[in-house]
Amino acid sequence: MLKGILEGCLLAVISKGETYGYEMIEKLEAHGFHMVSEGSIYPLLLRMQKEQLITSIMKASPNGPKRKYYTLTPKGQQELKDFQERWNLLSHSVNQLMNNKK
């Protein structure tokens, strides 16, 4: 059931604009996702790229080596929309269960 939550969150971060891996981790941490590491997001990014949900391009960095920047594809935008719908249903059900005093 919880499978795909991090993927959905990554899609949401990428949907805000072109971004690279470490920047995604920082953005997730800013929203309370302190358990996310490079080791957890890079395999997901690779899989999402293979599934054509995202694309990447290497760009020069002012602070060192080139960085791989990710953007959403139209398929990725649709997957994000689908994720948001699934999340809304799931969170509504969990909230109802948790607030039920019986």
Walk through the language-model features, giving the residues of each.
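Short, well-ordered turn and helix-capping elements at secondary-structure junctions
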Residues: L28, G32, M58-A60, P74-G76
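Amphipathic alpha-helical dimerization/coiled-coil segments
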Residues: Q78-K102
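Basic, amphipathic "hinge/linker" alpha-helix immediately C-terminal to the N-terminal HTH DNA-binding motif
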Residues: K66-Q84
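Short, charged/polar surface micro-motifs in flexible loops or helix N-caps
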Residues: K16-Y20, K50-E51, G76
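Beta-hairpin "wing" of winged helix-turn-helix
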Residues: E51-K66, T71
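Short, hydrophobic-biased segments on the C-terminal half of alpha helices
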Residues: Y42-Q49
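N-terminal helix-turn-helix DNA-binding core of bacterial DNA-binding proteins
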Residues: M1-Y42
